């Protein structure tokens, strides 16, 4: 697909709008029964989603219009604030064994979501100064790796292993794209793997989740239930699906049907064509985001657009791979579709950064 430079911004915003609209429709049908069960009002969760979506559009406009140089200069205070927010989660109660949220006046905030923004701006600012002819020695990379390691370990200690793995993959891809020597990237990955394995084995439930993923039918009514239910929902959708609102898996048959496994609801009700449309939108989102990055007029803007696009795309692909049984079930949700106020707000903030970069593109 070849797109004129002048059309990139329009194409990107159109895909973004389609993702938001499609996600809203699928969220409504996936949350209808749960909302009725929890509150007696089938529309309660949907209206809550609309409120968060309105707020997220305001955030989008802020990040689309804010000075990127201002963000670049203020990144260290932002990192410090993010660090304290993540540390504050250890004072909050656990949910499903993880300390991911801060609760305040009935509102929950997930600081690891905010770290996506901090991570994007910090790495973009740092890598924008990189010159492989002058500073490709390992000493140049110690600072970003140390900062990343601090946040990564804190997220692991929250018992949010899946988010930690997500950030690690994102970090490695960005290092590779930044022209870091391949030998360094390889050495970092080789070092990371045993460390990651140790953290994995420290919690027996993580190991059992891996075994359930490898052999879900060994425990079909227990640890393998989510995977089997998700696959059955996707299979039952066929080509055209059962019809919007006509799915059964959301009726209490699949836990997290409106969050982690919302893709299964989509597949059951809208079929293979609905699934293909969603995946195509995510690929187009990354495609246009990437081309906005390579046609930006500075290295800093390149990384802002690239990392923001990659962060959303990578998360979406991980969630989809979980739904189709190619990754173990985790707490990774589907951007634009799944429930979660922090998630949609941060997703729209990153989308706003891409839009910000798209306002001034170059043919170079």
From Swiss-Prot:
The keyword Secreted does not apply. It is a multi-pass membrane protein. PROSITE patterns: FTSW_RODA_SPOVE (PS00428). Residues 34-43, 96-100, 158-160, 203-271, 323-333 are periplasmic. It is an enzyme of class 2 (transferase). The keyword Glycoprotein does not apply. Keywords: Cell cycle, Cell division, Cell inner membrane, Cell membrane, Cell shape, Cell wall biogenesis/degradation, Glycosyltransferase, Membrane, Peptidoglycan synthesis, Transferase, Transmembrane, Transmembrane helix. InterPro entries: Cell_cycle_FtsW-rel_CS, FtsW, FtsW/RodA. Coiled coil: none annotated. It catalyses: [GlcNAc-(1->4)-Mur2Ac(oyl-L-Ala-gamma-D-Glu-L-Lys-D-Ala-D-Ala)](n)-di-trans,octa-cis-undecaprenyl diphosphate + beta-D-GlcNAc-(1->4)-Mur2Ac(oyl-L-Ala-gamma-D-Glu-L-Lys-D-Ala-D-Ala)-di-trans,octa-cis-undecaprenyl diphosphate = [GlcNAc-(1->4)-Mur2Ac(oyl-L-Ala-gamma-D-Glu-L-Lys-D-Ala-D-Ala)](n+1)-di-trans,octa-cis-undecaprenyl diphosphate + di-trans,octa-cis-undecaprenyl diphosphate + H(+). One of its GO terms (cellular component) is plasma membrane. Pathway: Cell wall biogenesis; peptidoglycan biosynthesis. Belongs to the SEDS family. FtsW subfamily. This is Probable peptidoglycan glycosyltransferase FtsW. It comes from Borreliella burgdorferi (strain ATCC 35210 / DSM 4680 / CIP 102532 / B31) (Borrelia burgdorferi). The lineage of its organism: Bacteria, Pseudomonadati, Spirochaetota, Spirochaetia, Spirochaetales. The gene is ftsW.
